[in-house]
């Protein structure tokens, strides 16, 4: 009986060892494939380069799309953007609205040259974006995304990613425009409050407002808000837009939003559908002439009435 028990014990130990060895081989195979993908990322060269004689000055915040079409890959069958002909004046406030997958974000990513247009030309300040020094262009085109990042460090340190040389007064002013100063001032340590990695110790709306303030510190010619007030209540959202109209009128402001309330007071609103411009106009003009905008507005206001 003892010999049988010993045999079973040793057999079980051998079986476990064989299983662990097989798991090691599986992990080695997975690690090898992961290593290949990491190496591909590290060795991938940029397809965007500075021209031989780059332009180092962005004259103003005007933006022109001249018959622009774009797709993310040359192998792609369908254009993400098609036949975009759009002219934005410097200092103008532009709203962009449309359904999911209508390429709203793709449109604005061409302005800061995160991608190059497949066809046509994109100009900023009257100059083709391909002719600019990349760093110069991107310093003058500030983008705030819906899920922007805060880093571990104090609020001051996070804000100074927008401008390392910003004074304390400039930090406070930017936060006031972004409607962030009020809640920051309520923290025991104020602007020296420590932010956890990813901003986990502040709410989504507070994080978005701090990211907007950080972008404002760059003093850009063009400010792009890509659904970056989605976690902010409508009253605060309106106060942010009001402050921008009053204090940075010379800055071109492009607001991508899901809520019509976020773009109603824009100088012009662009309605996107299927990678194309479906309509352009003021809120009143689109309510009269654009079915897509009217449907979005009606559905959101019906939902608001039901919630009330």
Question: Where are these predicted regions, by residue range?
Answer:
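An intracellular "coupling" helix at the cytosolic face of ABC transporter transmembrane type-1 domains
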Residues: 27-30, 47, 71-76
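Cytosolic ends of transmembrane helices, especially the final helix of ABC transmembrane type-1 domains
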Residues: 13-41
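Pre-NBD coupling/linker segments of ABC/ABC-like ATPases
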Residues: 47-58
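ABC-type nucleotide-binding domain
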Residues: 56-308
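Membrane-water interface of transmembrane alpha-helices in multipass transporters/channels
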Residues: 1-9
């Amino acid at each position: 009986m003892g010999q049988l028990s010993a045999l079973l014990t040793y057999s079980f130990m051998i079986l476990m060892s064989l299983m662990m060895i097989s798991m090691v081989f599986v992990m080695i195979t997975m690690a090898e494939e992961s290593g290949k993908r990491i190496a591909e990322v590290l060795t991938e060269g940029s397809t965007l380069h500075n021209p031989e004689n780059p332009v180092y000055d962005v004259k103003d915040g005007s933006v022109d799309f001249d018959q622009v079409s774009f797709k993310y890959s040359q192998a792609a069958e369908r254009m993400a953007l098609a036949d975009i002909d759009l002219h934005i004046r410097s200092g103008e406030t532009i709203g962009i609205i449309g359904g999911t997958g209508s390429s709203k974000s793709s449109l604005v990513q061409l302005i800061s040259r995160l991608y190059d247009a497949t066809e046509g030309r994109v100009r900023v300040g009257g100059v083709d974006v391909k002719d600019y020094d990349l760093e110069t262009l991107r310093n003058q085109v500030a983008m705030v995304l819906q899920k922007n990042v805060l880093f571990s460090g104090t609020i001051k340190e996070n804000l100074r990613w927008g401008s390392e040389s910003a004074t304390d007064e400039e930090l406070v002013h930017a936060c006031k425009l972004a409607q962030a100063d009020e809640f920051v001032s309520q923290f025991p340590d104020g602007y020296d409050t420590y932010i956890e990695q990813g901003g986990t110790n502040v709410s989504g709306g507070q994080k978005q407002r701090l990211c907007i303030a950080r972008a404002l510190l760059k003093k850009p010619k063009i400010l792009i808000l890509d659904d970056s007030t989605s976690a902010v209540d409508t009253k605060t959202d309106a106060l942010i837009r009001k402050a921008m109209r009053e204090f940075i009128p010379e800055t071109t402001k492009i607001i991508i939003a899901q809520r019509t309330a976020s773009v109603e007071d824009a100088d012009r609103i662009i309605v996107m559908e299927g990678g194309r411009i479906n309509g352009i106009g003021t809120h009143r003009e689109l309510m009269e002439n654009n079915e897509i905008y009217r449907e979005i507005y009606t559905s959101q206001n019906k939902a608001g009435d039901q919630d009330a």
